[in-house]
Amino acid sequence: MLNNILKIATRQSPLAIWQANYVRNQLLSFYPTLLIELVPIVTSGDLILDKPLMKAGGKRLFIKELEQAMLERRADIAVHSMKDITISFPEGIGLAVLCAREDPRDAFISTHYASIDLLPTGAVVGTSSMRRQCQLRERRPDLVMRDLRGNIGTRLEKLDKGEYDALILAAAGLKRLDLAHRIRMIIDPTELLPAVGQGVIGIEYRLEDTHILSILAPLHHSATALRVSAERAMNAKLAGGCQVPIGSYAEIEGDQIWLRALVGSPDGSLIIRSEGRAPLSQAEILGQSIANDLLYRGAESILCRAFQVDS
């Protein structure tokens, strides 16, 4: 830390700033005299809004500039939505802390309709997530899926202007920005499986800065980390990114961890699902096992087609 000031790299969107301030306030509750400064950064993902995320370069577009700021020592840590953090890290960067998970589910937002089932044929649903599009197309093939980029406020404005009949957004982001009143329906994971790490704030740090890791330690939530480790182990085995719809959600039940996962074709015509339970100590092994089962059931062909198109 330069001049004993902890510098937090963050994107400039309202949700990202909220998350960075959340981390700041949590740290101050443990260390009232700690000096903390936010370092807002515009990322490539914030600038490229005219094409789907998978065609623009994937989720690294939202984090690479923040990681670069850390490597250049313009920032000490970086705060992200965990679902945006890729499986691999640049040399010298690692994952320090996972904060307690907010609501991991997706939310249905509409000005005229109370639920997905009440949308009329041909209704336009806004979401850029292939995972959401795939599962919605399986459930309602008569709906029109349209990409939607930008921060939460921009997306809601487009809905209010009538450009979309409904939106699907992460419930956690809406709740954090005091926009829960816009939610018409929370979608159960049995109907729409969340993304890996959804609802979790993750903090990256420089591996050499062990003193910063110790400062961050009180923010770490072990149960959340266990759940996300299973989800990310599954994703890593599948080499999942933005090229193919992948959903994964882990829950703790007593001394067991329960993991559900899916891989789907973008058009929703084929979705491969798997689930399983294991002792808490085998969370990552469970994730790998579920990935292998998905591959055995036919996910490999979906992944191969996606990567061929992407290349």
Curated annotation (Swiss-Prot):
User: For this protein, what is the EC number?
Assistant: 2.5.1.61
Q: Name one Pfam family in it.
A: Porphobil_deamC
Q: Which reaction does it catalyse?
A: 4 porphobilinogen + H2O = hydroxymethylbilane + 4 NH4(+)
Give me any GO biological process, just one. Answer: protoporphyrinogen IX biosynthetic process
Could you tell me which residues carry S-(dipyrrolylmethanemethyl)cysteine? Answer: 242
Is this entry keyworded Nucleotidyltransferase? no
Against CDD domains, the record matches this protein to: PBP2_EcHMBS_like
Its cofactor is: dipyrromethane
Q: How is the cofactor bound?
A: Binds 1 dipyrromethane group covalently.
Q: Name one GO molecular function term.
A: hydroxymethylbilane synthase activity
Which pathway does this chain act in?
Answer: Porphyrin-containing compound metabolism; protoporphyrin-IX biosynthesis; coproporphyrinogen-III from 5-aminolevulinate: step 2/4
Class of enzymatic activity (EC top level): transferase
- Which keywords label this protein? Porphyrin biosynthesis, Transferase
Q: Per the record, GO CC terms?
A: cytoplasm
Entry's HAMAP family?
Porphobil_deam (MF_00260)
Relate the protein's function as given in its record.
Tetrapolymerization of the monopyrrole PBG into the hydroxymethylbilane pre-uroporphyrinogen in several discrete steps.
Q: What else is known?
A: The porphobilinogen subunits are added to the dipyrromethane group.
Quaternary structure per UniProt?
Answer: Monomer.
Q: Give the protein family.
A: Belongs to the HMBS family.
Specify the protein name: Porphobilinogen deaminase
